Amino acid sequence: MLRCVIPSVRATATTRTFVRFASSQGYIDGIAALKQDLKKAMLAKDNLRKTTIRGVLSTIKNKEIDSKDKDLDEFVLYDVYAKLISQRKDSIAEFVKNKREDLVEKEANEIKILENYQTALPVASREEVDARVVQILTDLKESEPSIQLKQVFGKIDWKTLPGELKASPAAIRSSISSQFKKVFQ
């Protein structure tokens, strides 16, 4: 009788995090938190949190593929969360119109989950960005009282301002557009 002995292989469990080389630390930490929470949700069998996080990770992966030559940072994550929250709010409006209260509740819970991740990012809040933009616009108004909105965008140093404000360029542009009329009237 022949006996085959298979040597036992001792495997060690290691976790690997694959992120883009040029990503900021805030971005890396945000992705790591999402993946860790996904594992926890799977173990807890929390389907709502699990599907929400999977959707977020999928959206982020698509964003990485679309912007393969650009640096990714926490501002990209903030914009992704803002977009997903906006989509959920639009869905809630449609579901209320069609009297689908079960789906309204599901979308509202997803918004809470997304907002928790959005507030955890080291990014300035909308109010903080608006306050700083108003200050910048009033300084511009003092030096050039008849400046146009297009010219304001040209006067801003887009390489340093997002870092100073801890906000994405898209959030800053949106804030400038909304605050311009208030300051220049």
From Swiss-Prot:
Protein name, entry field: Altered inheritance of mitochondria protein 41, mitochondrial
Lineage: superkingdom: Eukaryota
Matches recorded under Gene3D superfamilies: Uncharacterised protein YqeY/AIM41 PF09424, N-terminal domain
Molecular functions (GO terms): carbon-nitrogen ligase activity, with glutamine as amido-N-donor
Keywords associated with the record: Mitochondrion, Transit peptide
Subcellular location: Mitochondrion
Main location: mitochondrion
InterPro entries cross-referenced by the UniProt entry: Asn/Gln_tRNA_amidoTrase-B-like, YqeY/Aim41, YqeY/Aim41_N
Family, as annotated: Belongs to the AIM41 family.
Organism: Kluyveromyces lactis (strain ATCC 8585 / CBS 2359 / DSM 70799 / NBRC 1267 / NRRL Y-1140 / WM37) (Yeast)
Annotated transit peptide: 1-21
Annotated GO CC locations: mitochondrion
Pfam families: YqeY
PANTHER family: ALTERED INHERITANCE OF MITOCHONDRIA PROTEIN 41, MITOCHONDRIAL (PTHR28055:SF1)
